[in-house]
């Protein structure tokens, strides 16, 4: 199949999606089996390469001494999954059309799990539901991937299919997939060069994959530099994540758990990096179960909303130099009542580092905008650093960088937006300048950097970025909303977007509704106590 990787991904998707349409299957019924076949094709490719290498090495030693038989361990020591004959992709493709193909693929998946214990209960085994004609066509389609492809083509195909399935599955898709450009921006700002990574809402593992690519791009081996840990509530999504790691040549300790109540990795103070896209505005969390949990050093919110539970999970998992980057509902930046008190303590700790406002239509499930939060516990250690004192005369640990990226995007289609590689690099460079670090320009951000930062040093840019002191944040009611600080660029009036403004007002209404609900609970509680006292 000639052509670049993007062409390969699109052609494979078009072929697979056409088969889905003809099969009358729902996307949710089709996605996991198809992703499983991509995984199998990857495993077969790696096994075939390792098999040739092992045989070549044995041929070179032939005659020197008696050689033992080749074993499963010979493949595992090379980091390759062992595939018995019945699990080879070519064997499945060559099966006669009269045979039960679904049953044969199920057997292949079971055999792989038996020979590779790390994959126990991970691989899909529901291929008998798809029908012979569909499976034969899928096998032939994926068999077209060339065996001598360069780079991470299988991982990119898997990731491409994940995104497409997430888009087609709507709300369910958004539960397991974060748009890649959002993930890349988080990774570029926290810069996970080396250390232990945690995603306590790991979904299909996109944060891990992009972190590994970041390490590779800086000429290092991810397996040597980063250790991967995750938790995910939905069992099927855990399996997607483990397959995703495998097709990218990564290993990780990802477990099924409800992060509100379970901390299987004993995370407090343990991790160098935390990344996540948690579910927003979750209610009915049983706070009695977690009231003594050390993961919540600033106390539990009284409001029936899980946002500040998640924020503290991320904060508490960081070690003394750790950084976190995560997606959060806009309402979290201005929430009042007990959530304000938690936010105040977080800001006073000095860990709040960078806040990035992202526009609407970046996600597949909701059109609302969001905010990216970045924490850095290492900021408190900057007193002796040459970069510690900013141009405004205040140590960096007493400031927060606010970036308004709501008007920075590429329109993918009518309903979806994304960041381009140059835009991601540009936004990350603003954070790098704020931290006194060297910028990167390999992705095409040079022109944007020259326009706004011609001297190569940080400065506030109206409508884009502003460094704000803790005192000024306190004066604004401890708000972490970039829109309150960054101001408006001169051309903003011409670019006025009614939908964008309506969305912002909707977010403000959410905050007010949350506050009203919290006050209602307080009044109800106080009334109950008063009646008990009078009785």
What do these predicted ranges mean?
Residues 209, 239, 276-278, 308-312, ...:
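Feature representing long, continuous alpha-helical segments
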Residues 172-276, 281-285, 290-297, 308, ...:
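Conserved S-adenosyl-L-methionine
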Residues 382, 389-391:
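Leucine-biased recognition of intrinsically disordered, low-complexity hydrophobic segments
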Residues 30, 271, 293-295, 305-306, ...:
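Active-site lining segments that contact anionic ligands and/or coordinate catalytic metals
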Residues 41-54, 165, 215, 219, ...:
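A generic secondary-structure signal for well-formed alpha-helical elements
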Residues 27-30, 34-38, 238, 242, ...:
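Conserved Class I SAM-dependent methyltransferase catalytic core
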Residues 285-305, 330-338, 359-365, 414-422, ...:
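Short, contiguous acidic/charged loop-to-helix segments that flank catalytic cores in large enzymes
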Residues 1-193, 253-267, 357-361, 378, ...:
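Non-catalytic, mostly N-terminal accessory regions of nucleic-acid modification and defense proteins
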């Amino acid at each position: 199949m000639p052509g670049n990787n993007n062409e390969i991904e699109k052609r494979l998707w078009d072929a697979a999606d056409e088969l889905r349409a003809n099969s009358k299957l729902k996307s949710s019924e089709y996605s996991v089996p198809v992703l499983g076949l991509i995984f199998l094709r990857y495993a077969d490719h790696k096994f075939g390469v390792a098999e040739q290498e092992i045989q070549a090495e044995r041929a070179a030693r032939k005659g020197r001494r008696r050689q033992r038989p080749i074993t499963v361990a010979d493949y595992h020591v090379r980091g390759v999954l062992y595939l018995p004959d019945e699990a080879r992709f070519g064997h499945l493709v060559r099966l006669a059309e009269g045979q039960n193909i679904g049953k044969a693929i199920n057997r292949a998946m079971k055999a792989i799990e038996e020979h590779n214990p790390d994959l126990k209960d991970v691989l899909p085994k529901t291929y008998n539901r798809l029908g012979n004609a569909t499976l034969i066509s899928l096998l032939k389609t994926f068999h077209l991937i060339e065996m001598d492809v360069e780079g991470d083509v299988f991982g990119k195909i898997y990731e491409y299919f994940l995104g497409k399935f997430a888009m087609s599955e709507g709300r369910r898709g958004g539960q397991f997939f974060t748009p890649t450009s959002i993930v890349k921006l988080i990774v570029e700002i926290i810069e996970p060069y080396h250390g232990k990574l945690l995603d306590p809402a790991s979904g299909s593992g996109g944060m891990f994959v992009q972190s590994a690519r970041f390490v590779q791009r800086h000429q290092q081996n991810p397996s040597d530099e980063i250790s991967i840990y995750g938790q995910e509530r939905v069992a099927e999504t855990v399996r997607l994540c483990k397959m995703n790691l495998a097709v990218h040549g990564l290993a990780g300790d990802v477990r099924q758990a409800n992060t509100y109540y379970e901390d299987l990795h004993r995370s407090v103070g343990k991790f160098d990096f935390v990344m996540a896209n948690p579910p927003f505005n979750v209610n009915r969390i049983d706070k009695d179960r977690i009231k003594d949990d050390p993961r919540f050093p600033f106390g539990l919110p009284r409001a029936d909303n899980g946002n500040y539970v998640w924020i503290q999970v991320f904060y508490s998992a960081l070690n003394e130099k750790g950084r976190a980057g995560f997606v959060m509902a806009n309402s979290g930046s201005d929430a009042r009542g007990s959530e304000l008190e938690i936010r105040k303590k977080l800001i006073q700790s000095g860990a709040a580092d960078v806040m990035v406002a992202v526009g609407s239509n970046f996600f597949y499930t909701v059109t609302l905008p969001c905010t990216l939060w970045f924490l850095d516990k290492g900021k408190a250690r900057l007193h002796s650093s040459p970069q510690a004192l900013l141009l405004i005369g205040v140590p960096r640990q007493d400031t927060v960088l606010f970036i308004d990226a709501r008007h920075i995007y590429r329109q993918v289609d009518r309903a979806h937006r994304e960041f381009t590689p140059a835009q991601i690099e540009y936004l990350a460079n603003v954070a790098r300048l704020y931290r006194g670090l060297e910028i990167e320009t390999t992705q095409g951000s040079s022109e944007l950097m020259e326009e706004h930062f011609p001297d190569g040093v940080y400065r506030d840019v109206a409508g884009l970025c502003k460094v704000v002191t803790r005192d000024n944040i306190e004066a604004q009611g401890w708000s972490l909303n970039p829109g309150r600080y960054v101001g408006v660029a001169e051309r903003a009036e011409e670019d006025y977007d009614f939908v964008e403004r309506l969305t912002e007002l909707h977010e403000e209404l959410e905050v007010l509704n949350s506050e009203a609900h919290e006050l209602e609970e307080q009044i109800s509680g106080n009334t109950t106590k008063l009646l008990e006292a009078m009785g």
